[in-house]
């Protein structure tokens, strides 16, 4: 794989919209917002975004009702089987 096929960046994902859903659904909605934000930043489908379990741990660290207001992730996109895939890790 050449360097031009790999796109690596740090992305800060704002999670302020998570307050628009009921408190008992906030951590799950935060995970959806992270996936949507990364898909938009890298211009791929949401199905092509792979989130590391460390992101899940960071979102759920304060429980379901109180996810963080923003999250910094390290994301990289690369070609796999002819499709672009994005993998993201928590940058804490």
From Swiss-Prot:
It holds the Pfam family Ribosomal_L31e. GO terms for biological process: cytoplasmic translation. Keywords: Ribonucleoprotein, Ribosomal protein. One of its GO terms (molecular function) is structural constituent of ribosome. The keyword Electron transport does not apply. One of its GO terms (cellular component) is cytosolic large ribosomal subunit. The keyword Ribonucleoprotein applies. Coiled coil: none annotated. InterPro entries: Ribosomal_eL31, Ribosomal_eL31_CS, Ribosomal_eL31_dom_sf. Belongs to the eukaryotic ribosomal protein eL31 family. This is Large ribosomal subunit protein eL31. The gene is rpl31e.
């Amino acid at each position: 794989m050449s360097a031009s096929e790999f796109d690596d960046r740090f992305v800060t994902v704002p999670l302020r919209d998570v307050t628009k859903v009921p408190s008992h659904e906030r951590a799950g909605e935060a995970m959806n917002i992270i996936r949507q934000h990364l898909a938009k930043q890298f211009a791929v489908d949401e199905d092509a975004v792979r989130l590391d379990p460390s992101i899940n741990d960071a979102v759920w660290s304060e429980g379901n009702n109180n996810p963080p207001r923003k999250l910094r992730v390290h994301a990289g996109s690369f070609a796999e089987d002819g499709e672009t895939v994005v993998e993201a890790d928590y940058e804490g």
